[in-house]
Amino acid sequence: MEDGTFADALGAGIDLQPHTLNSGTEAIEALFSGAIDAAFVGPNPAINGFAQSGGEALRIVAGTTSGGAALVVRDGIDAPDDLIGTTLATPALGNTQDVALRSWLAGQGIDATTEGGGDVSVRPQENADTLTAFVDGAIDGAWVPEPWATRLVLEGGGHVLVDEATLWEGGRFVTTQLVVAASYLEDHPALVRALIAGLLDSIDTVNADPAAAQAAVNDGIEAITGKRLADATLAGAWAKLTFTPDPVPGSLEGSKEHAVAIDLLEPVDLSAIYDLTLLNQELSDRGQPPGGGARGPAGGRGAANPPRPQPVIRPGRRPSACGSRARRAG
């Protein structure tokens, strides 16, 4: 956004209005209300928004990041059984990492209720509060996204008990994707394709010069929070993520199944959540093949293979969702 890539892709006469929001849930609410037209959100907010609207409100049109989440714990916890009686944090009840933790605990035969009871007490809270609580010894660990996982290790003295990448086929699982309002996609397909083109251009920029991309990310973090990440934190987190237009649809279905299994989501059919037609058209024009296993509305193959995956970080204390509105000026 800040370097003008998206504005250039949209072209003259289009008023791009970016918004930073506090969470994926807030972004979906803004999408519902018409306050924004598109947003970068995690998988579970997209699933929840799709389910709440009866499959009518939104479509996933591209992936953005894959990977980058872990369960980091204090010394003395080296196996699942060591977690009995501990307190673990997640970013929010029902969010992507919260579902991942509760699902993994259930798979280990460890009970954790949504009220904070059970064998392990799960405490949903802001990531910044989690870091402070971990350093102070008020919690025993947390399942969090990057760069918070790396910060818990480097600043909190923790170690990784579970790297979420080890739980997914090929180590690939969606962490951020581009969603648009279904009505906006229907009414303005050319503008949505331009947004996708801007995303692909951004991916190319990151892939071509990761060092410059890291510096740009840190500049953005400093502009929002007033403080830069340490170079070691940024590098450690960067190595855990992949910036890719592939929405990794199999992992979205897996996240849904996990949420249903632990009673955080009613069963929902996600077969219509993807519309990757415009992404595939843009990739084709760039000489890149489609792929990834999702299906478009007409039954065509969806998703997209990354043009050479490179790691990317999600900003530090930056809000966890970003929305935008694109309108013709005048």
Report the location of each language-model feature.
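Pocket-lining segment of extracytoplasmic ligand-binding domains
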Residues: 119, 129-221
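Short, solvent-exposed loop/beta-turn-alpha elements that line the ligand-binding surface or hinge
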Residues: 4-13, 166-171, 239-248
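Extracytoplasmic/secreted envelope proteins and their assembly/folding machinery
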Residues: 3, 28, 32, 43-46, ...
